[in-house]
Structure formats: structure tokens, C-alpha cells
Regions:
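Residues within the alpha-helical elements of helix-turn-helix
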Residues: 12, 23, 53
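Short alpha-helical "recognition helix" segments of helix-turn-helix
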Residues: 20-21, 50
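DNA major-groove recognition helix of helix-turn-helix/homeodomain DNA-binding modules
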Residues: 45-60
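Residues in the helix-turn-helix
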Residues: 19, 30, 60
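A short, Lys/Arg-rich alpha-helix, primarily the initiator
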Residues: 1-16
């Protein structure tokens, strides 16, 4: 199972969903799904914009656990 750790990364950096929306140009509603880990299909464009804005690697946002 793949889970997003966006909430943890954002909390650690002190970035809100609203601020991330401003930094990335991605709609708040879309980021909210990533933040709450309810997104079904990951968009590479969205992940790239998030990584760029938060100055992090994709591995910082995704966690793989065996289910």
C-alpha cells in the first residue's frame, strides 16, 4: 500500500494547505485530498509542484508498506 506523508512534511515545515496552494498554483481542494490521503490516482504534475514548493524529494511524500 502506498500512503502520502504530505501532512507530516507540511506540519514539519509549518506550511498550511492554503499557503501550499499559493506556492504551487494547485487548487486547495486538490491539495486537500493529497493532505488527507484520500486521493485515488497520483498526478505526477501535482507531486512535482509539491516537491518543488516544499523543497523535498518524492520519497519524502510517499511511503510504501506491505499489506
Amino acid at each position: 500500500m502506498i500512503t502520502l506523508t504530505l501532512k507530516e512534511v507540511m506540519d514539519k515545515q509549518g506550511v498550511t494547505r492554503y499557503r501550499l496552494s499559493q506556492l504551487t498554483g494547485i487548487q486547495y481542494a486538490i491539495l486537500d485530498k493529497y493532505y488527507k490521503n484520500t486521493v485515488i490516482r497520483y498526478d505526477s504534475y501535482v507531486l512535482d509542484r509539491i516537491c518543488t514548493a516544499l523543497n523535498c524529494d518524492i520519497a519524502d511524500l510517499l511511503k510504501h508498506t506491505k499489506s
